UniProtKB/Swiss-Prot annotation:
EC number: 2.5.1.75
Keyword set, alphabetical order: ATP-binding, Magnesium, Nucleotide-binding, Transferase, tRNA processing
Complexes and interactors: Monomer.
Binding site for substrate: 19-24
Protein name, entry field: tRNA dimethylallyltransferase
Catalytic activity: adenosine(37) in tRNA + dimethylallyl diphosphate = N(6)-dimethylallyladenosine(37) in tRNA + diphosphate
InterPro entries linked: Dimethylallyltransferase, IPT, P-loop_NTPase
Residues binding ATP: 17-24
Similarity comment text for this entry: Belongs to the IPP transferase family.
Any Pfam family matching the protein: IPPT
Keyword Manganese: no
Length: 316
């Protein structure tokens, strides 16, 4: 698409960043001064009843700046990148038709990628192949299967942790079904996003600062009743750690504590570590992201002004 035809497309803003970087606070500030409507891009915020551990915007924040695509699934339900793309496109069209600009804010980079580039033609799940993979895992362990993926698709293996059975089995399943690697297939894009997108990423200047923010926020969540929130989910009886909702960072570790598998101190330690690992993965995505403007989360006023400098002209 040439620059002229691209300029005629409706406008959209991406505000991306690692967990605990101040994305939500900045988005709320921007809504006060720009004709934007917010769309959440977060695979944890979609779940109802999961508010504290996901750092979901509170009632006052949502009153000041409503977020779309929050609380749209029960924790027992699945939600894919394809589901997100469909829902986000519908919301973006509605916002644009009302003469406003969609501002998509969050840290689920796979969702941003699916929205921006379209979805690659991955094969559907095959229960027989998946069962064979799980049987292998039971016999050899997931570490051995990760080594197998390393030989088949080193790029995917570098991105997928050996302790992430869902993503690991999916990467192997894709190869066994199609004969092509996950990396190869994901380089084949679907329909590109029909918007002119201004992309921003917000993060602290150093990893140490981000780690401090993560640890502080995890302790704030605990003080705000995170344990009680997870106990309520646990008491339902229909949720388990194979579900994407309960595998969310923090929830999985608290679940292990409630089940008596680990101590409280170990839960806190693992929860903070898992959140740091999530932030590291998010930063890896962002460093390789094309066309992104970086903002310093330690200077929110300056970050806001930088966005306004770029976006102010398109909002007039």
């Amino acid at each position: 698409m040439n620059d002229v035809s691209k300029a005629s497309l409706p406008k959209a803003i991406f505000l991306m960043g690692p967990t605990a970087s101040g994305k939500t606070a900045l988005a709320i500030e921007l809504r006060k001064v720009l004709p934007v409507e917010l769309i959440s891009v977060d695979s944890a915020l979609i779940y109802r009843g999961m508010d504290i551990g996901t750092a979901k915007p509170n009632a006052d924040e949502l009153k000041a700046a409503p977020h779309r695509l929050l609380d749209i699934r029960d924790p027992s339900q699945a939600y894919s990148a394809a589901d997100f793309r469909r829902d986000a496109l519908a919301q973006m069209a509605e916002i644009t038709a009302a003469g406003r600009i969609p501002l998509l804010v969050g840290g689920t980079m796979l969702y941003f990628k699916a929205l921006l580039e379209g979805l690659s033609p991955l094969p559907s799940a095959d229960p027989e192949v998946r069962s064979r993979i799980e049987q292998q895992a039971a016999e050899l362990g997931w570490e051995a299967l990760h080594q197998q993926l390393q030989e088949i698709d080193p790029v995917a293996a570098a991105r997928i942790h050996p302790n992430d059975p869902q993503r690991l089995s999916r990467a192997l399943e894709v190869f066994f079904i199609s004969g092509k690697t996950l990396t190869e297939l994901t380089q084949t894009s679907g329909d590109a996003l029909p918007y002119q997108v201004h992309q921003f990423a917000i993060a602290p200047a150093s990893r140490e600062l981000l780690h401090q923010r993560i640890e502080l926020r995890f302790h704030q969540m605990l003080a705000s009743g995170f344990e009680a929130e997870v106990r309520a989910l646990f008491a339902r009886g229909d949720l388990h750690t194979d579900l994407p909702s309960i595998r969310c960072v923090g929830y999985r570790q608290m679940w292990s504590y409630i089940e008596g598998e680990i101590s409280y101190d170990e839960m806190v330690y693992r929860g903070v570590c898992a959140t740091r690992q999530l932030a590291k993965r998010q930063m890896t995505w962002l460093r390789g992201w094309e066309g992104v403007r970086w903002l310093d989360s330690e200077n929110p006023d300056r970050a806001r002004k930088e966005v306004l400098q770029v976006v102010g002209a398109i909002a007039d």
